[in-house]
Structures are given as C-alpha cells and as structure tokens.
UniProtKB/Swiss-Prot annotation:
It catalyses: a quinone + NADH + H(+) = a quinol + NAD(+); a quinone + NADPH + H(+) = a quinol + NADP(+). InterPro entries: Flavodoxin_fold, Flavoprotein-like_sf, K_H_efflux_KefF, KefG/KefF. Keywords: Cell inner membrane, Cell membrane, Flavoprotein, FMN, Membrane, NAD, Oxidoreductase. It is a peripheral membrane protein. This is Glutathione-regulated potassium-efflux system ancillary protein KefF. FMN binds at H8, S14, H15, A16, N17, M65, Q66, W67, Y68, T105, T106, G107, G108. GO terms for biological process: positive regulation of potassium ion transmembrane transport; potassium ion transport. It comes from the Bacteria. Its cofactor is FMN. Gene3D superfamilies: 3.40.50.360. It is found in: Cell inner membrane. The gene is kefF. It comes from Escherichia coli O157:H7. It is an enzyme of class 1 (oxidoreductase). Its EC number is 1.6.5.2.
C-alpha cells in the first residue's frame, strides 16, 4: 500500500499539489492522509498515524516547499509519530524495509536551489534522507515539481501525470 502524507497548509490555494493529489488518488492501493485537514489544531493522533504507517509499503511526504523546508505540521508529525522505541532506538523497527518518497512542489526553478558551495536540490533533502535512513527506511530519489507559480495548466497537469506514473511504476516493481 502507498501511504501519502499530504501536508499542504493552504490546500484551497493549491494548484500543483492539488493536481498531484487528484492524480494519486485515482490509483488502487493508495491511502492519503491530509494532515492539515485531520489536525487543524496540530493535535496529532499518534496511534492512528502509526497504524496507517504500519500498513504502508511506500510512504510519500507530499507538500509544497516552504522556506527551503517542510511545512510545520509535517515537521511536528515526524517528531511525534516517528517516536523512540517505535521508529528508531531500542526496539524501534516499525519502519524498517519500507520505502520513502519525498514529493515536493516549488515556486522557483531548479537553478534557484543552487545554494552556496553545495549546488543542487539534493542538499535540501539531506535532513529528510537522514531521518529516513536513521529509521530504517529506503530513501527513493525525490519527485520535485518546480516553477509551479509560472507553469500553465497543461504543464502542471503533465507533471501531475508524471507523479502518478512514478507511483504506478513503484507499485508494479514491488507488487507485480
């Protein structure tokens, strides 16, 4: 099962993530948990989230980039749900062997993320990748949709279909 942890603080204003969301939900074997809809008060049901994660083979963190990072509710979700003794530490093996895909949208172009002495978008994924590895998850190459503020509808829709295709290819490779 693919579990998408959807973390868009302003989903009604989304045009790129919304299209990705709509494409992904047409696939069989996909569960989407919209964090800002489930937890507008930021009071996360840790047991429910861990139960959803336990059913997943692929976990997707889908969100818009905010200040070169993840939205605050997703950060809190990771802090609370990936708990010691469950996700890491002594006895913390619940996520071992599962896969993690970071699916992110940005307003800027790919070259916008060439920062300092470490050019490239991959630098921004390092904290997430380190978290994944620390918890025994298999990190997959990220899916990034850039320039979403200036893309026309046709381009956005094409990128959203590419995202769906990426999920479908993962399903086919891992479940035949």
């Amino acid at each position: 099962m693919i579990l998408i942890i959807y973390a868009h603080p302003y989903p009604h204003h989304s045009h790129a993530n919304k299209r990705m969301f709509e494409q992904a939900r047409t696939l069989e074997g996909v569960e989407i948990r919209s964090l800002y809809q489930l937890y507008p008060d930021f009071n996360i049901d840790i047991a429910a989230e861990q139960e959803a994660l336990s059913r997943a083979d692929l976990i997707v963190w889908q969100h818009p980039m905010q200040w070169y990072s993840i939205p605050p509710l997703l950060k809190l979700w990771i802090d609370k749900v990936f708990s010691h003794g469950w996700a890491y530490g002594h006895g913390g093996t619940a996520l071992h062997g599962k896969h993690l895909l970071w699916a992110v949208t940005t307003g800027g172009g790919e070259s916008h993320f060439e920062i300092g002495a470490h050019p490239g978008f991959d630098v921004l994924s390092q904290p997430l990748q380190a978290t994944a590895i620390y918890c025994g998850l298999n990190w997959l190459p990220p899916f990034a949709m850039h320039c979403t503020f200036i893309c026309d509808d046709e381009t956005l829709e094409g990128q959203a279909r590419h995202y769906k295709q990426r999920l479908l290819e993962w399903q086919e490779a891992h479940h035949g």
